[in-house]
Curated annotation (Swiss-Prot):
Top class in the EC scheme: hydrolase
Keywords, in A-Z order: Cytoplasm, Endonuclease, Hydrolase, Nuclease, tRNA processing
Protein's name in the database: Ribonuclease P protein component 2
InterPro entries: Pop5/Rpp14/Rnp2-like, Rnp2-like_sf
Catalytic activity: Endonucleolytic cleavage of RNA, removing 5'-extranucleotides from tRNA precursor
Complexes and interactors: Consists of a catalytic RNA component and at least 4-5 protein subunits.
EC number(s) recorded for this UniProt protein: 3.1.26.5
Subcellular location: Cytoplasm
GO CC, any one term: ribonuclease P complex
Organism (species): Methanosphaerula palustris (strain ATCC BAA-1556 / DSM 19958 / E1-9c)
HAMAP family, A to Z: RNase_P_2
Length: 160
């Protein structure tokens, strides 16, 4: 059997979404079921079947979902409705839509390797250093009686 020519194939679109918070491992099948339930709840069974959605990639804090062309808005709306996956609270933030997976993979931010700093002393008080995304740094005071939080950026940390 010969493959169909490109003009007769079903056109697909891919949606890139960030998984918040970044869980290390969420199974693609579980994500598919959660998205399917959201689509069915919003648009019904007929529209859910017409979307032809699938989870292509799930990992590293990102999700790539496939759908038929013209229905990417419906998929993005359904992703925004999902609040729980496999008993874990989760949210999907739609970042981009493209016709190829390669273009979406270029948009994924690669995790930045940062040197781990265990403790930092500020004004005679010892703090635990927690480096977050986008150059944010949280300092949590060590001790069990009281916790004092300081919020810095990496530039402030380099000055010390």
């Amino acid at each position: 059997m010969k493959p169909r020519p490109p003009t007769m194939r079903i056109k697909k679109r891919y949606v890139l979404a960030a998984i918040v918070p970044n869980y290390p491992s969420i199974d693609s099948k579980v994500l598919y079921v959660a998205i399917a339930e959201a689509i069915t709840g919003l648009y019904g069974d007929g529209a859910g079947a017409a979307l032809h959605h699938a989870v292509v990639f799930a990992g590293d804090g990102y999700l790539i979902a496939r759908c038929s062309r013209g229905s990417e808005q419906f998929l993005a709306t359904a992703l925004a409705v999902v609040t729980e996956v496999d008993g874990q609270r989760v949210a999907f933030r739609t970042l981009a839509t493209s016709g190829t997976i390669h273009a979406l993979r270029r948009r994924m931010r690669q995790p930045v390797e940062r040197p781990e700093r265990e403790d930092l002393e500020v004004d005679g008080v010892i703090y635990e250093v927690h480096v977050r995304e986008s150059q944010k740094v949280d300092l949590i005071e060590k001790g069990c009686n009281s916790q004092k939080l300081l919020f810095l950026v990496e530039q402030d940390l380099q000055e010390r």
